[in-house]
A protein has these predicted regions:
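Nucleic-acid nuclease catalytic cores
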Residues: 104-132
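Intrinsically disordered, low-complexity terminal regions enriched in charged/polar residues
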Residues: 128-190
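Short beta-strand-loop-alpha-helix junction that forms the active-site gateway
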Residues: 74-91
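Basic, flexible Lys/Arg- and Gly-enriched helix-loop patches that mediate nucleic-acid binding at interfaces
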Residues: 87-97, 101
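Active-site beta-strand-loop-beta-strand hairpin of nuclease catalytic cores
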Residues: 24, 57-73, 79
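Acidic-basic catalytic patches of nuclease active cores, encompassing PD-(D/E)XK
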Residues: 1-48
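Short Gly/Pro-enriched turn/cap motifs at secondary-structure boundaries
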Residues: 51-53
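Phosphate/NTP-binding elements of NTP-utilizing enzymes
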Residues: 55, 76, 96-99, 106
């Protein structure tokens, strides 16, 4: 029988998959076995798998068909040391980013979903992409550069379309320019 922490993590992965399925009207599922089957020391497995198989074994969520660049990890924990994010030395967050980025390709949209007891849900995304928010924590990882931590509902309210766009295109520079141009005139963050 799985440990209570593993069950909690699996439950959160299913919750996120269901949320994404409902949000985008496309099938997202919890990855089978949910682990880095093609990450870390298992990179060589990519040589014998086709794109769909690789996508199925990246991260915790198998994305819908129109999200080929989507790479996600889900973490559900009792607590989180937010104060260490502010000091720039959060080993827990660094370990999660290591896990997320171990299976990442250069053009992937990498997103870390986090849930903490009595604190809520959050997303952590790379700041190299343009995101619409006025409420965030900024974190610089020594290994993985700059990230934003944003409250879950606020993030999805303002970035739902950007997630789909970034997950489907590899030319993020032109996406950023056109999406920012379209969003700024009508931006109302509150």
């Amino acid at each position: 029988m799985p440990s209570p922490q593993k069950q909690k993590g699996s439950s959160f992965e299913r919750e996120i998959a269901q949320f994404l399925t409902k949000t985008y009207n496309e099938s997202f599922i919890r990855a089978p076995g949910s682990g880095a089957y093609v990450g870390g020391k298992n990179q060589s497995r990519k040589q014998v798998l086709h794109e769909g198989q690789i996508r199925s074994f990246k991260g915790d969520i198998v994305p819908g068909q129109s999200f080929p660049l989507f790479n996600a990890e889900c973490k559900s924990y009792k607590d989180f040391p937010f104060h260490l994010v502010l000091t720039g030395d959060c080993k827990q967050l660094d370990a999660w980013l290591d896990q997320l980025m171990a299976v990442s390709e250069p053009d992937d949209l990498n997103i870390l979903f986090m849930k903490f007891n009595r604190k809520g849900k959050f997303v952590c995304v790379q700041s190299k992409l343009t995101w619409v928010t006025d409420q965030f924590l900024y974190y610089t990882s020594k290994k993985h550069k700059d990230w934003l931590i944003i409250e879950f509902d606020h993030f999805w309210k303002h970035n739902q379309d950007l997630i789909k766009t970034y997950s489907n295109k590899s030319d993020t520079t032109s996406i950023i320019k056109s999406e920012t141009k379209n969003l700024l005139p009508s931006l109302n963050l509150h």
